[in-house]
A protein has these predicted regions:
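Acidic, metal-ion-coordinating active-site neighborhood of RNase H-like domains
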Residues: 1-208
Length: 208
């Protein structure tokens, strides 16, 4: 924490930049642990690190592929210019963006301080085998549910406006849905979450 906001210590970045490509799953696990400590600052961290995560259990078939090489280089480049995060003022409205990929979801919270968008927290998650088969709309709702579990204190202390073109409001309140969507609707219903079109605010820190 500095006078500018919440910043990553330069030593943390230096350690990762000096890392050589992992040679086995244990070294990948070490890298994953380092990245976990920085997840708050990294947009789409699950997408960026997915090539590494896929190697975590491949002791016999471990191969640092070209995809891993590119992802590792791009990650180091991204870490050279991480955003400064900020804690929102109590009772201020927080805005949220969602990004859905085939194998991951990403979520970012921001708040507006005197007209300036300030990022609060990035959240990202790789889907498990069952979640990969969800419909795109279900994946998007899951992103919000996951964020409430990961960052409950923000959702409890603030109104959160999710900026999206998806019809979340009507779907989550519809009596026609059962199963997981109905369950998610109940989970989200305890928070003050609103849904507005993405054009409602100029996008600067969208996770896409």
């Amino acid at each position: 924490m500095t006078h500018r906001g919440i910043e990553v210590k330069s030593d943390q970045i230096k350690v990762i930049n000096n890392l050589q490509p992992p040679q086995n799953p244990k070294e990948v696990q070490k890298l994953s642990g380092m990245m976990a400590a920085l997840n708050r600052f990294i947009s789409r961290s699950a997408n960026r690190c997915r090539p590494f995560f896929l190697l975590l259990h491949k002791w016999k078939e471990f191969e640092w592929s070209k995809e891993c090489v590119v992802a590792f280089q791009q990650l180091k480049q991204y870490l050279s210019c991480l955003p400064i995060m900020s804690n929102p003022v109590l009772d201020k409205i927080i805005f949220a963006y969602i990004a859905v990929a085939f194998y991951a979801i990403s979520f970012v919270l921001i708040w507006v301080d005197n007209g300036i968008q300030r990022p609060v927290y990035y959240v990202s998650k790789l889907f498990n085998e069952a979640e990969v088969r969800y419909l795109p709309l279900e994946k998007a709702i899951l992103a919000i549910v996951y964020a409430t579990r990961k960052l409950p204190h923000y959702f409890q202390a603030h109104t959160v406006v999710v900026l999206t073109q998806l019809p979340f409001k009507s779907i989550l309140r519809s009596a026609d849905y059962t199963g997981r969507i109905a369950k998610w609707g109940t989970i989200l219903g305890v928070f003050d979450i609103k849904y507005m079109p993405r054009v409602s605010i100029r996008e600067k820190f969208s996770p896409i």
